[in-house]
Amino acid sequence: MILVDWQIEDRIRRGHIRVDPFEPGLIQPNSLDIRLGSHFVWYVPGETVIDPYDSETVCRDTEEMVADSIVLAPGRFLLAETLEAIELPDDIVASIEGKSSIARLGVELHQTGGWIDAGFRGTITLEMCNVNSRPVKVYAGMPIGQLVFYRTDRAARPYNMKQDAKYMDQQQATLSRYHENARRAEE
């Protein structure tokens, strides 16, 4: 079941869902608007192949900055953080969606990482890309996406109880940690 506005507000006020900082005016009929943070990370263009199982290539040739705004050039991909940190209980999951007004500028908010498991705690890393033919400027603090909350049965092993919860407690835009997976698939 998708939570509606009064359910979202009630669960946040009771501490069942934690959102910091919380602005009641960001609650929509079926979602909570989230804002862009100020930490950005991107790959420097080059020929180095990124191997998801090799942390050295994942972390090599990146730049990062903290800024009040950033210009996304056409085709530019970067990671950003949400201003809000969240904490989900073991019976609530969330999905992140871009705001249509931002999408209409050509800015995608996430590539495929739009699911937030029950038990997650931290900021959300956004996988942003400008598919417009023109540069687009985005600002820290601007509403950039929406969280949709779903009530589920209680998870037996919520994200915060998993031994391999790679992104638990992240507090800024975080590069892929795929290399922490137990084994490489057989080639």
Swiss-Prot record:
E.C. designation(s): 3.5.4.30
Site keyed Important for bifunctional activity: positions: G114, W115
MF (Gene Ontology): dCTP deaminase (dUMP-forming) activity; dCTP deaminase activity; nucleotide binding
SUPFAM superfamilies per record: dUTPase-like
Keywords of the record: Hydrolase, Nucleotide metabolism, Nucleotide-binding
Binding site for dCTP: K99, S100, S101, I102, A103, R104, D117, T125, L126, E127, Q146, Y159, K166, Q170
Origin: domain of life: Archaea
Protein's UniProt keywords contain Kinase: no
Biological process (GO), any one: dUTP biosynthetic process
Active site (catalytic residues): E127
Pathway(s): Pyrimidine metabolism; dUMP biosynthesis; dUMP from dCTP: step 1/1
Substrates-to-products reaction catalysed: dCTP + 2 H2O = dUMP + NH4(+) + diphosphate
CDD domains from the UniProt entry: trimeric_dUTPase
Function noted in UniProt: Bifunctional enzyme that catalyzes both the deamination of dCTP to dUTP and the hydrolysis of dUTP to dUMP without releasing the toxic dUTP intermediate.
PANTHER family noted in UniProt: DCTP DEAMINASE (PTHR42680:SF3)
Record family assignment: Belongs to the dCTP deaminase family.
Subunit structure: Homotrimer.
NCBIfam families, A to Z: dCTP_deam (TIGR02274)
Name of the protein this chain belongs to: dCTP deaminase, dUMP-forming
This protein's encoding gene: dcd
